[in-house]
């Protein structure tokens, strides 16, 4: 199946028009989930996913507190900020300017210097000085990556300069390890049809894997890190943590940059800790985890997901909304995948579609609790958007939840009937059932800005949501499909392709990895032709795909987390940098 056959179908064109304030009634129907104990029917045969308890309990969250106090370092941080701004003006050489921008971004400081970075990139695109770098592989690749990453129109044709008369990349390039590494990273920002970048990735990955240990140890460390997963696919806040430590090992490091990066990381970490405590109290008060014992209680994991998608400290409200959404998705997913009978699930889907408090009367007790949690939480989120930005977003939030539940019920019917969908049929439903659209639409209305409704129907927005969710789905399937099918679930993309093409699991997995590569190319196209107000959503879409790689890199990091997942949570949320 060719991935390009799947065209974006995400649209709000048929959504009801936003209501006037005077017609809002949903805030008057808030009902607590603790009204009565659930009554589980013994007549329905229930499945079990055998999920283990979360590695993180409420005690971990409540005792989470950093010794770092930003207010004790305010004057020093201001000085460091000034030093970096001065440095960005002082550096004249175009290559050194690009390297400085790249370093600032990789240290996690890009959000502090957006204006200065934009000025540098604008200068690069208009300056003839960069023409002198066209024979420098490192410079050409770095310029391409930075410009494309920031949405500039840039052609990969410059890389043809590094080919020989036979059309292949020159073997002499293998001596330039720094340039090869930069070209490898740049190749991951390709669009469909950019063959030279496909060739560049194959050429550089082959030769970088073959290098010995006879090179600068810091450069070797970067090569191995990149081959493990390219920068463009990495969870950026964890990458910043890794790069801060690596930058400390460099002989030519800038002390002000190194110090500022550590202070910023610690400062943002304290914001995360405060937010997580607030989310923990929300989840405890909601009572859903205790009432529905069959479902995954994964508040910390959901918050970790959220910080990967929305990591900028100024979007604290958005992180709160997205954490709630992620935990509700996790719970409702377990209702559909694990516990509910098909008849019950049909009723629940209908109730969500109606979005009426009276719809819960038809539900079994355990579903009433789940429905109320969804109804109340979503309406609270909508009320906040109405209060802060004057936007009535309930029709849009209701639509993505309805679409999600309808995609869940399709899979439940497939499972009940023993139906095996084609890969294309599966993916047309599965990019919605992975809940990417739910997450991104809620994020869109929670950035603290008055976001225009019509932007959700832009073709670029539809593509962003579609391909980000597709990467999320395919990464999830690579990591979890065997366990999910074993416990009784619809065939996933791997199994669908095995049945359809008559191939082994190994071949099917390679095909899914190919589809992930192709989906990234479609995602990369969303970086160009965007408008400024869509930039937070574009970043969130990219980061959602990156978090999929992070969480499913070595198994199911959400349902069955391992020691690597635990280490990552601690690095991001619990362990500050120490100062001498």
From Swiss-Prot:
Q: What does this protein do?
A: Monoterpene synthase (TPS) involved in the biosynthesis of monoterpene natural products used by traditional Chinese medicine to treat headache, inflammation and intoxication. Catalyzes the conversion of (2E)-geranyl diphosphate (GPP) into alpha-thujene.
Which gene name does the record give?
A: TPS2
Entry note about domains: The Asp-Asp-Xaa-Xaa-Asp/Glu (DDXXD/E) motif is important for the catalytic activity, presumably through binding to Mg(2+).
Coarse class of the primary localization is: plastid
| Residues reported to bind Mg(2+) 2 | 333, 337
Per its record, how is this protein called by name? Alpha-thujene synthase, chloroplastic
Q: Which residues does the record give as Mg(2+) 3 binding sites?
A: 476, 480, 484
Q: Which reaction does it catalyse?
A: (2E)-geranyl diphosphate = alpha-thujene + diphosphate
Q: Which organism is it from?
A: Litsea cubeba (Aromatic litsea)
